[in-house]
Swiss-Prot record:
One of its GO terms (biological process) is positive regulation of epithelial cell differentiation. The gene is Commd5. It is found in: Nucleus. Expressed in the zona fasciculata and medulla of the adrenal gland; expressed in kidney proximal tubules. Basal expression is higher in hypertensive than in normotensive animals. Pfam families: COMM_domain, COMM_HN. Keywords: Acetylation, Nucleus, Transcription, Transcription regulation, Ubl conjugation pathway. Scaffold protein in the commander complex that is essential for endosomal recycling of transmembrane cargos; the commander complex is composed of the CCC subcomplex and the retriever subcomplex. May modulate activity of cullin-RING E3 ubiquitin ligase (CRL) complexes. Negatively regulates cell proliferation. Negatively regulates cell cycle G2/M phase transition probably by transactivating p21/CDKN1A through the p53/TP53-independent signaling pathway. Involved in kidney proximal tubule morphogenesis. Down-regulates activation of NF-kappa-B. GO terms for cellular component: nucleus. CDD domains: Commd5_HCaRG. Its main location: nucleus. It comes from Rattus norvegicus. The keyword Ion transport does not apply. Belongs to the COMM domain-containing protein 5 family. This is COMM domain-containing protein 5. Component of the commander complex consisting of the CCC subcomplex and the retriever subcomplex. Component of the CCC (COMMD/CCDC22/CCDC93) subcomplex consisting of COMMD1, COMMD2, COMMD3, COMMD4, COMMD5, COMMD6, COMMD7, COMMD8, COMMD9, COMMD10, CCDC22 and CCDC93; within the complex forms a heterodimer with COMMD10. Interacts (via COMM domain) with COMMD1 (via COMM domain). Interacts with RELA, RELB, NFKB1/p105. Interacts with CCDC22, CCDC93, SCNN1B, CUL2, CUL3, CUL4A, CUL4B, CUL7.
Length: 224
């Protein structure tokens, strides 16, 4: 695993209800992106470009630990600040790369970064990565990494009701037992409280709804 670690889980990409644009940052920026936007205001461009080089290396799956230490020492960045810069920039780029260029235009990308308060010269460097000559290679690497991950091959669940043996009260305590198998042969079994199961149902329904809306919006843009 690279020194940057895994990026934050991808947030869905709803459309902006006011402008009709597709937001690559989701309904609201992740904590990593919000934090890095604040730090980038005081970061010089030379250091930022070195930072971007490390992030691109991490996206390619390279081990960047030694280079990270060298950057921290040369730029006089504390370990905590450097971690925020790396994680936030990594998350920001990864979220942008998850949308195809036809759905996320450079102008919309730069406008969202401006709203975060990121300096214009740094926005230009980020846009060059997201829409420049390196984009096809980054897309290819992302596809290869995604195809190597195991997928769910089997899933089932059932409601389980346990009767309390307490002498003071006997109450029904329903829960949901889940079992799934992955394509790598591993199996997992776990128990989920009813309340959490309902949250899961709602979240899945919401994501599916927003995916459908995004697909329709992309189709309309292609038709226009």
């Amino acid at each position: 695993m690279s020194a940057l670690g895994a990026a934050a889980p991808y947030l869905h990409h709803p459309a902006d209800s006011h402008s009709g644009r597709v937001s690559f940052l989701g309904s609201q920026p992740s904590p990593e992106v919000t934090a890095v936007a604040q730090l980038l205001k005081d970061l010089d461009r030379s250091t930022f470009r070195k930072l971007l080089k490390l992030v691109v290396g991490a996206l390619h799956g390279k081990d960047c630990r030694e280079a990270v230490e060298q950057l921290g020492a040369s730029a006089n960045l504390s370990e905590e600040r450097l971690a925020v810069l790396l994680a936030g920039t990594h998350t920001l780029l990864q979220q942008a790369l998850r949308l195809p260029p036809a759905s996320l235009k450079p102008d919309a990308f730069q406008e969202e970064l401006q709203e975060l308060g990121i300096p214009q010269d740094l926005i230009g460097d980020l846009a060059s990565l997201a829409f420049g000559s390196q984009r096809p290679l980054l897309d290819s690497v992302a596809q290869q990494q995604g195809s190597s991950l195991p997928h769910v091959s089997y899933f089932r669940w059932r409601v389980d009701v346990a009767i309390s043996t307490s002498a003071q009260s006997r109450s029904l305590q329903p829960s949901v037992l889940m079992q799934l198998k992955l394509t790598d042969g591993s199996a997992h079994r776990f128990e989920v409280p009813i309340a959490k199961f309902q949250e899961l149902r709602y979240s899945v329904a919401l994501v599916l709804k927003e995916m459908a809306e995004l697909e329709k919006k992309c189709e309309r843009k292609l038709q226009d």
